[in-house]
């Protein structure tokens, strides 16, 4: 296990998406283990580019007028997951605690259940 974390986000025109990406990276103890999978539904007047600070990312960009809803976007972003050790579904407007990645992995191991779900 290499502790790769797939962060799944479905975002519909959320102006805080880039903030969340920056925050999740800045507060991670091991940002090099982060992989982003995002369905970014952007408005015509919005910048569709995102900055991942050189980290691995898989992004599906959809003009907002072509969106078919939240579940549809989640389904698209789920398909971006490959062989990462952890899959975490997050919102596009979140703040993270310092070393959040290390803390959640520790919590997972404390369960002693390889199929544990943390919420």
Region spans (language model):
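Catalytic cores of eukaryotic secretory-pathway lumenal/extracellular enzymes that build
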Residues: 2-119
């Amino acid at each position: 296990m290499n502790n790769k974390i797939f962060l799944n986000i479905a975002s519909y025109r959320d102006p805080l998406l880039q903030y969340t990406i920056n925050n999740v990276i800045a507060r991670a103890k091991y940002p090099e283990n982060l992989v982003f999978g995002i369905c970014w539904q952007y408005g015509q007047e919005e910048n569709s580019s995102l900055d991942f600070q050189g980290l691995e990312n898989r992004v599906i960009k959809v003009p907002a007028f072509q969106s078919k809803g939240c579940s549809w976007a989640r389904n698209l972003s789920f398909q971006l997951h490959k062989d990462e050790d952890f899959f975490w579904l997050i919102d596009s407007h979140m703040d993270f605690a310092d070393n959040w990645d290390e803390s959640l992995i520790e919590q997972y191991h404390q369960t002693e259940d390889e199929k544990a779900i943390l919420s």
